[in-house]
A protein has these predicted regions:
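Beta-strand/loop-dominated core regions that host nucleotide or nucleotide-derived cofactor-binding catalytic loops
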Residues: 85, 119-120, 124
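Short, charged beta->alpha transition segments
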Residues: 97-100, 142-151
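A short beta-strand signature within small-molecule sensing/ligand-binding domains used
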Residues: 111-112
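Short, acidic Gly/Pro/Ser/Thr-rich loop/turn segments
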Residues: 44-46, 119-120, 141
Length: 155
């Protein structure tokens, strides 16, 4: 079975190299539990796991305590990352971006926050990106077995 860390490497590819290095140091059991990666400009890098929200240390560990020595991501790194997620063609993803998200290969959804550009009452673009929230898509085998068994009873 492919490990979660291998699956996550597709997501890690989009992270700035400096931030990616911290994630690559994480133990596999931590990677197995990541459901979201939260990146906010000039704030510590955080993840969401089954145990709640935690921060990533520069040593590749998890910390439940926010401190000044945690790695932060810059606004410029967030902009570069979104550009990479858009295949270096932000314009071709503009309709997704104005809806606040893009979808990566493999089904991971990436929420995008920034300043909305509004024309005639409609959001037409997003600029000055401030945060990215990567929701990790996972296959959970058998999760609907009980439901599908019930639906067969009523046929």
């Amino acid at each position: 079975m492919e490990s979660e860390k291998d699956f996550l490497s597709d997501i890690f590819y989009y992270l700035p190299p400096r931030i990616r290095a911290f994630f690559l140091k994480l133990p596999p059991n931590i990677c197995d539990e990541i459901t979201e990666i939260r990146l906010r400009a000039d704030k510590p890098v955080s993840i969401v796991t089954r145990n709640g929200c935690a921060f990533i240390t520069s040593g590749g560990r998890m910390s439940f305590i926010c401190s000044d020595n945690l790695p932060v991501i810059t606004g410029s790194e967030i902009s570069d990352m979104v550009t990479k997620m858009c295949g270096y063609s932000v314009y071709s993803h503009q309709s997704d971006l104005v809806n606040g998200f893009i979808t990566l290969k493999g089904g991971c959804r990436v929420g995008i926050c920034g300043t909305a550009v509004i024309q005639n009452g409609a959001v037409t673009a997003i600029r000055e990106l401030t945060s990215v929230n990567i929701r990790v898509a996972r296959e959970i085998k058998g999760c609907s077995d009980d439901i599908s068994d019930l639906s067969l009873i009523h046929i």
